[in-house]
From Swiss-Prot:
InterPro entries: DNA_Topoisomerase_II, DTHCT, HATPase_C_sf, Ribosomal_Su5_D2-typ_SF, Ribsml_uS5_D2-typ_fold_subgr, Topo_IIA, Topo_IIA-like_dom_sf, Topo_IIA_A/C_ab. Residues 368-370, 1016-1025 are annotated as: Interaction with DNA. This is DNA topoisomerase 2-beta. The record marks 515, 518, 687-688, 749, 783, 957 as: Interaction with DNA. The record marks 882 as: Important for DNA bending. GO terms for molecular function: ATP binding; DNA binding; DNA topoisomerase activity; DNA topoisomerase type II (double strand cut, ATP-hydrolyzing) activity; metal ion binding.
Amino acid sequence: MAKSGGGGGGGGGGGGGGGGSGGLTCVTLFDNQINASKKEESESVNKNDTSKKMSVERVYQKKTQLEHILLRPDTYIGSVEPLTQLMWVYDEDVGMNCREVTFVPGLYKIFDEILVNAADNKQRDKNMTCIKISIDPESNIISIWNNGKGIPVVEHKVEKVYVPALIFGQLLTSSNYDDDEKKVTGGRNGYGAKLCNIFSTKFTVETACKEYKHSFKQTWMNNMMKTSEPKIKHFEGDDYTCITFQPDLSKFKMENLDKDIVSLMTRRAYDLAGSCKGVKVMLNGKKLPVNGFRSYVDLYVKDKLDETGVALKVIHEVVNERWDVCLTLSEKGFQQISFVNSIATTKGGRHVDYVVDQVVGKLIEVVKKKNKAGVSVKPFQVKNHIWVFVNCLIENPSFDSQTKENMTLQPKSFGSKCQLSEKFFKAASNCGIIESILNWVKFKAQTQLNKKCSSVKHSKIKGIPKLDDANDAGGKHSLDCTLILTEGDSAKSLAVSGLGVIGRDRYGVFPLRGKILNVREASHKQIMENAEINNIIKIVGLQYKKSYEDPESLKSLRYGKIMIMTDQDQDGSHIKGLLINFIHHNWPSLLKHGFLEEFITPIVKASKNKQELSFYSIPEFDEWKKHMENHKAWKIKYYKGLGTSTAKEAKEYFADMERHRILFRYAGPEDDAAITLAFSKKKIDDRKEWLTNFMEDRRQRRLHGLPEQFLYGTATKHLTYNDFINKELILFSNSDNERSIPSLVDGLKPGQRKVLFTCFKRNDKREVKVAQLAGSVAEMSAYHHGEQALMMTIVNLAQNFVGSNNVNLLQPIGQFGTRLHGGKDAASPRYIFTMLSPLARLLFPSVDDNLLKFLYDDNQRVEPEWYIPIIPMVLVNGAEGIGTGWACKLPNYDTREIVNNVRRMLDGLDPHPMLPNYKNFRGTIQELGQNQYVVSGEIFVVDRNTVEITELPVRTWTQVYKEQVLEPMLNGTEKTPALISDYKEYHTDTTVKFVVKMTEEKLAQAEAAGLHKVFKLQTSLTCNSMVLFDHMGCLKKYETVQDILKEFFDLRLHYYSLRKEWLVGMLGAESTKLNNQARFILEKIQGKITIENRSKRDLIQMLVQRGYESDPVKAWKEAQEKAAEEEDPQNANDDASSASGSTSGPDFNYILNMSLWSLTKEKVEELIKHRDSKERELNDLKRKSASDLWKEDLAAFVEELEKVEAQEREDVLAGMVGKPIKGKVGKPKMKKLQLEETMPSPFGRRIVPQITSAMKADASRKLLKKKKGDADSVAIKMEFDEEFGGVQAEGGGDDTVNTAASGTKTPKLKREKKEPGTRVRRAPSSTKSSAKKVKKRNPWSDDESKSESDLEESEPVIIPRDSLLRRAAADRAKYTFDFSKEEDDAHDDDDANNNNDLDELKVKASPVINDREDEFVPSDSVEKDEYDFSPVKSKPSPEKMSQEKKNQDFGNIFSFPSYSQKTDDDTTKLDSDEEDSTPVFSSPFAPKQTEKMLSKTVAAKKAKVDVPPKPKRAPKAKKMETVNSDSDSEFGIPKKTAAPKGKGRGAKKRKTSGSENEGEYNPGKKAPKSTPCKKSKKAAFDQDSDVEIFQSGFASETAPKPRTGRARKEVKYFAESDEDDDFDMFN
C-alpha cells in the first residue's frame, strides 16, 4: 500500500518521493506506462471482454499537465526537432552575422524564457544593473544571474510553500495574472521558467531577499519530477537571483550544446545588452561591448556598404522612454530587428508595422516628388528598402504563441505612442533609402522600356497604322533607307507624291500626329504610353538606350536615316527640335553618324511670266523685296503648310533633292550644349538669357534697319545643330512667349488681339454667335490655329463673373460661365452670342487706329502690333501665361483706381499705390510683403453652432470649394473626424452663401484656431512674375505695378500727342475741303464761275488758276501713307501704294461731283454751317493739350462704365422685383423671401481675417530666397529696362475696412490695427447692413471691390451684423431713390459715386453718419483729389441703420463692387502708418483734411475736364463707396424718403446724389454738379451736412467711378460733318 501510494504520488505530482524500506524510489510517467502495458498484455489472455474494455481506455486517455508538456512540447516551447534556417547569430570570429544555423527551437526557447525573466526584473527594480550569463557547452550547464530585487523568501499562506518554489516548481503560477495592472514585462502566461525546469535534467534556483533577510536554494531534477528540500539561510547582503540548469538534451535529440545553438544564445545575450537600458551584461565572465541600443545596432551595420560603396547611415531617435528606433537602408528586402519588453520578436508584429507605416508614408511622399520615371511606387516597394530596429516597452503584450516571435497587440493598447519627428523623417530621406528606391524605379522603368520600347530588325513589321514602309527596310540595304517623318497626314500625301520621282524602295513615310513628347523631361509612364515614340522605335529598329558608337551597330537598324519633313513655320521648327531632342537624349551617338536630315519646302513663291522664285524664309523674301524695285509686278503666293503645295510641286521638290534636303552635321560639344539648352528643365535660367539676347539683337537690328538672320540660303546644303537651335528653333521659343505673354500696352495676347480686331472691323450692331465670330476672326485676321481655341478666347473675353474680367470687352449674351465652376460651365459656342461691349471703343478709341502699326500676314493686313487703350488694360483684367523661359502672372486692379492714378499723373502727381482688386469681390485683400498678398473670404458666426460663409477667396470656385473642403469636413476620414455636422447652400450664380452647422465645442476650437484657416478661406497671391512685352516687343520684368503704370503713361501720353497731330492734319484737310466746296458753290451762285459747256481740262485749269486745291483729304491721306511706307517699307500696303500712285494731276472730283441740290439755299447754308463748325472744331482741338484729350476720354469712359455697371446690377435683380401696382407711383417691391434666402444673415458676427506673424515671416523668407536666387536672372531679364527699379508701393489703404466694423453704431469707428506694412483691400463687408459688404468682390473682380476694401479700415473689433444692418437701414431711409435714376446712381455711387458725393460735400466730423454709407461705402471728401476713391468710414447713426436695415440687407448683396480703391486721400493714408493720418480711415470726419482735399479736388476737376464741369461727376465715382446706400436702390428696394434724423436736407442731398447717379445710369438725366447736389450727397452720406470732409475719405474707398457728369459727351471731331465717308476711318 505504502509503495503503491508512493508510486501514485510520484506519478501524479512528480513532487515528492515514495515510501519504502529505505532509499528514495523515483517513478516516472513512462515507468507507469510501461508497467500498465505489461499488465494489460498478461491479463488479456483468454479475457476477450476485458480486453475490449482496456483498449477503449488506451484510446481515450487523460494526462496531467506535466505529462502533456512532455508528450506534446511543441504546444509550449515550439518544435523539438532540429531546424535549419537563416538566423542572426554572434560568432566570436565574425561578430554579428546572418547565416544558416541548425538549432532546436524548443531549446532556444527555454533558454530565452529565463533570460527574459532576468530582464523583466529591471522593470520591477530600476536599481538592477547587471545580468551575468554563463554557457558551458562541455558540461551542459547554463547559468543566468541578475541583481536587483530578489524573489520574496517567504512561505505562501495559501499554497503553504515558499514563493520561489511556487513560481519555479509548480505550473500555472505567475505574478503576471493581474490584467488590471499595466506591466511592461515579458512574462505573461505562467509557463516560462517552469518549462525550462521541465525540460532540464537539473534546475537550481538561488535567490536572496534583503527585505525578508533570507536566502533560498532549491534544486529540481528529472524534468521537474524530483526535487530536494529548499535550503533557507539568514542573509544580509544585496538581493540577487540565479538560475542554473542543465537542459535535457535527449528531449531535443541532441548530444551536446553545439556551436550553432551557442552562437544563437550568445546573440540573445547581446540582444539583452542592447535592449535592456542601464544594465550591463556579462557573458562567461566578460562584459559585452554594447552600450545602449544605438551601439547594439552597429553590430549589424558595421562594415556594411550601400550600392555606391558608402557605409550605411543609421538614423536613430529615442522617441520617449518606451520607444527607441533606428533606421537604415536595406539591400535584401525589408528587414527588422525588434524587441518587446526585451523579447526578441523575430517575426515582427504590430509594433514594427506601427513604426514602419509612419516611415513608409513619409518616404513615399518624397519618392513621388522625385520620381521622374513615372513608375507607380507602392508602399510595400518602399518598405523593401528599409531596415528598421525597434526597441519598445509595451503594456501587457500579447503574442500569437508561447514562442513570442510575433506581437499581436493592437497599437491602441500599447500604453504609449511613437510619433517620429520631422527631423527623423528628413534624415531618413537623406540616408540613401530614397536614392535606392529611385534607382530601383529607374531600373524597373528601364526594364519595361527595353521590353516594350525596343525593336529588333525585321524585314516586315505589322501593326503600325499609316506607315508606308520602304521596300528595302530591314533587309541588306537597310542602311541606305530613309524614313520620312511628316507633320500630319496632308504632309504625308505630299511626300507620297514625291516618292513617284525617287522611288519607294529606299524611302518610307510615316506621319506624326503633332508634336512628339519631350522625352528629356517625360516620365517613364509617359514614354511607355506614347504611341508616337514607340512607333518610331519599332519602325527604325532602335534598341532603347543601346549605344550606336560603332558604325557596325547601325546595321541592326531598319533605316539608316530619318528625314524630317514639317511645315516651314515656327511650329514645324519645334517638331524638328523635339525629334532631334528625342534622338540626342536616348542615342546621342546617332547624331555623329549623320542620322538626321530635314526636307525644306518654300514658304513664299514669287512668279512673273514663266519665271518663278522660291524663298525658304520670310527674312530672305523681305530682303529680295527690298532690292527688287518692281516687286509689285510679281505674283506672290504664301505657303503656310505642306498641304498648300500641289502634287505637281511635290514632284518638283523631290526631283531637286539636292536643294531641298538639308543634312544635320554634328560639330562637337557645342551642339550637345545647344540641344540641352533648348530642352532641359535644368536650363531655365540659361534659356532666359538665350531669349533675352535674341530679343535684344532683334531690337538692335530693327533700330538700325538691318535684316533678320535666316537659314536656308541658296548655298545651304547642311547646318549644325547649334545653328538650328540658335537661328530657327529660337523663333519658336520667342513666338511661344508672344502667344502666351501679353503686351504691356494693351494687355492682350495675339489671339485676343485678333478677336478684338475682327470685332472692331465688323462693327456689329447685332449680337453674333460665338462660333460664327470665331470663323470670322480666322478669316479676317489670318488665324492659323484651331478655331476651338479661338472660341475659348472669345468666351474668356466676355466673362464677367467674380474672378474673371474687371472690364469685359465683349458682352456675354448667354451662359458664358459663372463663379460656380470658374467659367467651365459655359455653354457650347454654338449656342451663345456676343458683341462688342459699349466700353470697348471708349477704351480703344477708333481715332487711335490710324496711329498703330498694323501687321501683315500672307500679304493681308491684320491686327496691329498692339492697340493703345486709354488705361493699362493689363492691370484692369490682369494677365497669366506660361511661355518658354518666362511666365507671367498679374492680378486685376480696380478700374476707377487706375483712372484716378492716370489723372493724378496728368496733373503731375505721383500715382497712389494700388492693391489687387476683383470686381464684385466682397472679401479682403491684404498686403503681406512686397508683391505678396493674402486674399480672404468672409465668414460670420451666426450662433453657438452655426457659421455662415458669404465669400470665398478669389478664384476659389463654389462647387470646387464644396467638394474639396466642406464635404471632407462633413464626412471625415479615417484619420480626421468630421468637423461639421451639416451645411446648406443658398448661392446664386453671382453670390456665395454656405450655412454650416457644427457642435458648440468644435466651433469654439475652430474659432480659436482661426475660422479662416480652418475653413480654408485664405489664399496667397504673389506678384513676382510681372513679365510683359514692352512696346518694342521685348520681354521685360516689372518689379511693381507703379512701374507698369508709369511706362504705360509715358507711351500713351506720347500717342495722345501723335493723335492730336493726326487730328489737326485731318481736320485741317477736312476744313480746307469744306472751305473749297463752299467757296465754289458761292462763286457759282454769284456767277464768277461757269462750268457749262466747258471741257474737263478747261474746268480743272480754271480751278487751279482760281486757287482751288486738289482734294485736300485725299492728298493728306496719301502723304500719310507715303510716310508710313518710307518708315516701314516691308509692311507697306502694295495695293494702296499702287492705287495712289496710279493717278496723276489734281483731283477736283470732290467739287465737281457735287449734286445740283448743293446750289439750293438750304444746302448752301448747311454747307457754310458745316464749314464753320469744322473750323471751330479744329481751333478747339489746337487749344487742347494731349492731357486734355486724355482726360476727355477718361471722363467719357467713366460715364459709360457707370451705365454699364448700373445695368449689370439691374440684371442681377431681374426676377426679384415684383410688378408695380397699377396706379401706384414708385419702384416695385423686391421679392423679399428670395432675397433674404441668399443674403447674409443680419445677426452674424463677422470674423476679421488675421495675418499672423508666421505668415509674415514666411513671406519674408520667400522674398529673401527669391532675391538671392534671382539676382542673376533678374539682371538677365531686365538687361534692357533701366528705367524702372521701383519697389512695390506701400499700401494703398492701410487697412481694409471691416464691413462689420464699419457697421458699428458707435460714433467712433474702431479701426483694426494693422501690423506695420500691411495694407488691406477690403470689399464691403458681407454684413447685410453694409451695402458695401455686399459689394465685396470676389477676389477676381477688381473694379469695385478694390476701392471699397482699401477705403475701409477694418476694425479688428467684430460687430454684430444686425446692428450694422439697422444702421444701414436708417441711412437708406435718408435717401429716397427712384429706381430709375437714383437707384442707378446709387449703384454707380456705390461703385464710384461715393467719391463724387464726397468731393462735393464738406464733411464734419460728425458721430452720426449714414451708417450704411459710412459703414459700407466710405465716401471721399471733396478735399481729396477728384481721383481719390479711398473709402473713409463714417460712423452710421444707429437709428438710420434700423430703418434701412432691411433695405441694406438687400443692398449689400447686390452692391457688387467692393471698393478698396485708394484715392489721393487713400494714398496719404497709405503713406502714413497711423490710422488717423489716412483721411479715409480717420475719425468719421477730419475737417481740415477734407477742406484741403476739397480744394484739391476742385482744382483737379477744373484741370480735368474741358467738357462742362458738371459732367465732372467724378466725385460721385468716389461716392462709389456709398454703394451701400445706393445698393438699396440697386436692388429695386424703395428707399425711404424720410430725412435722416433731424436732417431732412440730408435726405435731399442723398437724393441729389442719387439723381446724379441716376443720370449716369440714365443718360437722359444728367444733373450738373451744383452746390445742391453736394448737399444732397452730404445727406446721403451723413445726416450731417457737414460731412464734407468725410466725403473725401469715402470717395477714395469707393473707387470713384468717374461720374458721368464729368464728361458726359465725348468730343466729336467729325460727327457733324456730312461727309461721313471721309471719317469712316474713325468709326
